[in-house]
Amino acid sequence: MHELVQDIQHSLERVKDPTRVEQMEAYMKNNFSFLGVMSGPRKEIFQKHKAQLLQLKPSASWEFIYECWANQYREVQYIAIDFLLANYKKFAQPSDGTALTFILSNQTWWDSLDLVASHSVGHFATKFPTEFKVLAQEWEESEHFWLHRTLLIHQLKYKQKTNLDLLQYYIRTFKSNKEFFIQKAIGWSLREVSKWKPIWVQKVVLEENLQGLAKREALKYVPEA
């Protein structure tokens, strides 16, 4: 597995653009080190390794993801996310809670969390509802706000299948946290629902007395009365 990750890193290094590093790192608030590889070339590299990666068993899949996550370069971590998005539905297991928690709470920023939350966690929650209920309780009780953001946005892809009662519960639970990424997530989750249930969104905004960023984002697509 180490050789595979090394091979991927070497492939990324061959297409890196050092002139982009400063801009890419600044965009992520200098939280991560970048090689300077844009998404297009990175995805081409992933495609070259995709066939090999898709043959991995569940335990080996997580081993690969963990090794990518331990790499110093963000683009290697992005490859792990590319892999999750492409294949998680095929290797998902009811015991994945610990691994998902690790990915969501380490090397964390919106660029990684939002994709994992809305795709991988969203799938885990529907495929293993009993296990997710236990996991969600742990996340709710955690002091890690990124896990709270995950609970707020994991239903983004559900559309009309969104559990509205559950969404409002999490909004009510976390709305007092003025952290930007929480308020943004509240508004984002409601904005998605407003595309098909705008009156419900208006009701929630009033009932929960949402203000500022959360309110603006929630009502972005809702016609004014």
Identify the role of each PLM range:
Residues 1-225:
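Alpha-helical scaffold domains
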